[in-house]
Amino acid sequence: MSPNQTPDNTPVFQLKGSMLAITVLELARNDLESLDRQLAAKVAQAPNFFSNTPLVLALDKLPADEGAIDLPGLMRICRHHGLRTLAIRASRIEDIAAAIAIDLPVLPPSGARERPLEPEPEAKKPEPEPTPPPAPAEPEVRPTRIITSPVRGGQQIYAQGGDLVVTGSVSPGAELLADGNIHVYGAMRGRALAGIKGNTKARIFCQQMTAEMVSIAGQYKVCEDLRRDPLWGSGVQVSLSGDVLNITRL
């Protein structure tokens, strides 16, 4: 081994878990022409949202009696509008086969990911001597993350395990993420995603709602929908009821 070579047992990579906010595009029917037109309308309303946005194509709600979808064509339409397909979610055999043919990862249908696993039964072992139960672990409480400076376009701020408070304004193209609630005391013009690990009780509080997108536990509204709300530009709170986002005055 030359003096400049690194020993082979020195690790050159690490595998790390990560939580990313990924948009899911759920198709209700196989109609790529209509999809192209409707995506173009969405892009016109919130262009910053459709800028190299990672995407999962959800095909598991397509009717079983509809023909096979043109998956490469669907991906081209998404790419044309700034959406970068990472994987599909599918249950129909023809959709899964089409994804495998182009080396695109296939995720299980939405319900399958939430189904509890049933462990294999194990052979009965001799019962050990009883031991006193361990003291319950103290729950990990993460402090609220507070940002006192303006959040500029292109910035992404994440409050892991807690709430996020921004005392200034949030510019277009900026992104706020929190496992808990999000509070913005300035103008909210970027994207706010609360409860991103599935907390349906999370809320978003804004003193001036002019956001590109708001989302709670994966349910979202984009600028086009928000502008039609009579509380656009006002102080509001956003909450989730079932799969419906509710916007009410503060």
UniProtKB/Swiss-Prot annotation:
SUPFAM superfamilies named in the record: Cell-division inhibitor MinC, C-terminal domain
Pfam families the record matches: MinC_C (PF03775), MinC_N (PF05209)
Chain segments carrying region Disordered: 109-142
Gene3D superfamilies in the record: 2.160.20.70, 3.30.70.260
Superkingdom per UniProt: Bacteria
Basic and acidic residues bias spans: 112-128
Alphabetic keyword roster: Cell cycle, Cell division, Septation
GO biological process, one term: regulation of cell division
Record text on subunit structure and interactions: Interacts with MinD and FtsZ.
UniProt-listed HAMAP family: MinC
PANTHER family: SEPTUM SITE-DETERMINING PROTEIN MINC
Function: Cell division inhibitor that blocks the formation of polar Z ring septums. Rapidly oscillates between the poles of the cell to destabilize FtsZ filaments that have formed before they mature into polar Z rings. Prevents FtsZ polymerization.
Similarity annotation: Belongs to the MinC family.
Name used for this protein in its record: Probable septum site-determining protein MinC
Organism ancestry: Bacteria, Pseudomonadati, Pseudomonadota, Gammaproteobacteria, Pseudomonadales
